[in-house]
UniProtKB/Swiss-Prot annotation:
Residues 1-24 form the signal peptide. Glycans are attached at residues 194, 209, 218. The gene is PRNP. This is Major prion protein homolog. It comes from Gallus gallus. GO terms for cellular component: basement membrane; plasma membrane; side of membrane; synaptic cleft. Keywords: Amyloid, Cell membrane, Copper, Disulfide bond, Glycoprotein, GPI-anchor, Lipoprotein, Membrane, Metal-binding, Prion, Repeat, Signal.
Length: 273
């Protein structure tokens, strides 16, 4: 009997110990109503704080949403000086605005045409040629060096006088063909003369371009000009050939040398008479 009672007491103590351990673990995992979460909800100084949710100075601040100077400011969106400013997109002071780029006239690079040298008159190019302008390489042609101080041979004193009075109006260089191989003098001079009178628009072809009234009024002057200038061009072409011959290393044959001397003597005799 005593042994049974002792066994029951031990079982009761063991059951009580297990229950106490289980309750302690349950209390640690899930806090009861006395934890920090429940206590925080019952804190009287936080949810009913009068200075935060019912602050009359923030949501009902009349100075911010109803500020008449910001959303309805007439000076910003309707500023006449920016979007409708006539001086910006159509600014006439900037070269080539709205036209693109053109190296010769500032025009558009759209539909740009290749540059072509203008047709010049013998008189009009006098200043540029005398100043040493480079006009070489036009269609296989080249322009010779400046020939100043040459003594030209004319047929009459009137021609000498006319050239002395008007020589400053004309260039002192000629065009010649850019040959790939040496050529004789007659070929060089003929090509040089034809190219030069064509480029300078003188001679019979120039007479056709003038009106009949102007041609009749200046007939004497035009005839004198054509006569004198064509002689000057031919002599400049001869001089240009001499320089071309020296640069190319061309040697004259004896017959050509005697012919050149004879022509020079004849020209001198005609000039003396």
């Amino acid at each position: 009997m005593a042994r049974l009672l002792t066994t029951c007491c031990l079982l009761a103590l063991l059951l009580a110990a297990c229950t106490d351990v289980a309750l302690s673990k349950k209390g640690k995992g899930k806090p009861s109503g006395g934890g920090w979460g429940a206590g925080s909800h019952r804190q009287p100084s936080y949810p009913r704080q009068p200075g935060y949710p019912h602050n009359p100075g923030y949501p009902h601040n009349p100075g911010y949403p109803h500020n008449p100077g910001y959303p309805h400011n007439p000076g910003y969106p309707h500023n006449p000086g920016y979007p409708q400013n006539p001086g910006y997109p159509h600014n006439p002071g900037y070269p080539g605005w709205g036209q693109g780029y053109n190296p010769s006239s500032g025009g558009s690079y759209h539909n740009q045409k290749p540059w072509k040298p203008p047709k010049t008159n013998f008189k009009h190019v006098a200043g540029a040629a005398a100043a040493g302008a480079v006009v070489g390489g036009l269609g296989g042609y080249a322009m010779g060096r400046v020939m100043s101080g040459m003594n030209y041979h004319f047929d009459s004193p009137d021609e000498y006088r006319w050239w002395s009075e008007n020589s400053a109006r004309y260039p002192n260089r000629v065009y010649y063909r850019d040959y790939s191989s040496p050529v004789p003098q007659d070929v060089f001079v003929a090509d040089c003369f034809n190219i030069t009178v064509t480029e300078y628009s003188i001679g019979p072809a120039a007479k056709k371009n003038t009106s009949e009234a102007v041609a009749a009024a200046n007939q004497t002057e035009v005839e004198m000009e054509n006569k004198v200038v064509t002689k000057v061009i031919r002599e400049m072409c001869v001089q240009q050939y001499r320089e071309y011959r020296l640069a190319s290393g061309i040697q004259l044959h004896p017959a050509d040398t005697w012919l050149a001397v004879l022509l020079l003597l004849l020209t001198t005799l005609f000039a003396m008479h």
